[in-house]
C-alpha cells in the first residue's frame, strides 16, 4: 500500500514455469494483491503460481496476450485495487521497480507509467535484437508525431495504471494479440490521461517470451493501423468504439471464462 492506495500486481502468463518464481520473489511488500492469469499453458505455470500464494486464474483456452490482460485487469479491479502494475512472468523486466512505478501513480501526477527500455540505453545492453530496436525507434517516432505526445517508447510490457484509467478505457474493443499494449496507450492519450516514464533495464534470454520476426512485422502493421484509427477518430472522419466513451469496458462487460484456483492453506509450506 502506498499513500493509502492498494497496489495490485498482475501477471499475464503463458508457459512461464521456469521464470515465475524469480519474478514473484522480487515483488515488494508494498504489493497488496498478486494475481496471475494463465492463458492455458502447457507446463505447470498455474500449479506453481498457486504454490507461491498468488491468486491464480486459468483460461479455458489460449485466448492471447491481449485477452489475458483483460482478465488481469478485471480481477484486479474486482479485488479492490487502486493501482495496478502489470509485470511479465518471464522475468524480462525487474519487479524491483514496482514500488517506484506505483508511487508515481499514487502521487496523483500520472495515470499510466511505462517502464522504458530505451531511457538509459537498457534495451541494447540487455540484448534486444537490433531489428527490434530499429522497429521500436521508427514506430515510436511515428506515433509521437501523430499522437501528439513524446514518449521514449510505446512497446514496453511493464506498466502501471490508476483504477480510474482501467475503469474508463474501452479495453474490450482492443485486440487479443500483442498490439493490445499499443492500443491501450493510444486510448489513454485520447481520453486525456497523463502518462509518465521510468528507466528500466531489460533482459533477453532463452526463457524470456519474445515474439519472432514475423510476429514483430504483424505488430508493426497493427501499430500503424491503431495510429490511423486514432487520427481518423480525433478528426471525426470515423467513429471508432475503441476511442469512444461508449466502448465496452472490462469492469462492466467482460465475458472470458477463467477458473480461479484455491490457494494452499499455508503458501510458504505448500
Model-based region annotation:
Residues 38-46:
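A conserved acidic beta->alpha catalytic loop
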Amino acid at each position: 500500500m502506498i499513500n493509502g492506495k492498494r497496489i495490485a500486481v498482475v501477471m499475464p502468463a503463458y508457459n512461464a514455469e521456469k521464470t515465475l518464481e524469480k519474478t514473484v520473489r522480487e515483488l515488494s511488500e508494498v504489493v497488496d494483491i498478486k494475481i496471475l492469469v494463465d492463458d492455458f499453458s502447457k507446463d505447470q505455470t498455474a500449479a506453481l503460481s498457486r504454490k507461491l500464494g498468488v491468486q491464480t486464474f486459468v483460461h479455458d483456452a489460449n485466448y492471447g496476450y491481449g485477452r489475458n490482460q483483460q482478465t488481469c485487469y478485471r480481477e484486479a479491479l474486482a479485488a479492490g485495487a487502486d493501482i495496478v502494475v502489470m509485470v511479465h512472468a518471464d522475468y524480462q523486466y525487474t519487479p524491483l521497480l514496482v514500488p517506484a512505478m506505483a508511487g508515481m501513480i499514487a502521487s496523483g501526477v500520472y495515470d499510466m507509467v511505462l517502464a522504458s527500455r530505451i531511457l538509459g540505453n537498457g534495451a541494447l545492453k540487455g540484448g534486444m535484437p537490433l531489428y527490434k530496436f530499429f522497429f521500436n525507434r521508427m514506430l515510436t517516432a511515428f506515433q509521437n508525431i501523430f499522437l501528439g505526445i513524446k514518449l521514449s517508447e510505446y512497446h514496453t510490457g511493464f506498466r502501471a495504471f490508476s483504477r480510474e484509467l482501467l475503469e474508463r478505457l474501452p479495453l474490450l474493443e482492443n485486440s487479443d494479440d500483442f498490439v493490445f499494449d499499443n492500443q491501450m496507450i493510444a486510448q489513454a492519450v485520447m481520453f486525456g490521461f497523463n502518462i509518465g516514464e521510468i528507466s528500466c533495464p531489460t533482459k533477453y534470454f532463452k526463457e524470456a517470451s519474445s515474439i519472432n520476426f514475423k510476429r514483430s512485422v504483424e505488430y508493426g502493421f497493427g501499430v500503424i493501423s491503431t495510429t490511423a484509427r486514432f487520427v481518423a477518430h480525433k478528426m471525426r472522419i470515423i467513429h471508432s468504439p475503441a476511442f469512444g466513451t461508449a466502448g465496452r469496458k472490462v469492469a462492466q462487460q467482460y465475458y472470458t471464462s477463467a477458473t480461479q484456483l484455491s490457494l494452499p492453506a499455508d503458501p510458504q509450506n505448500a
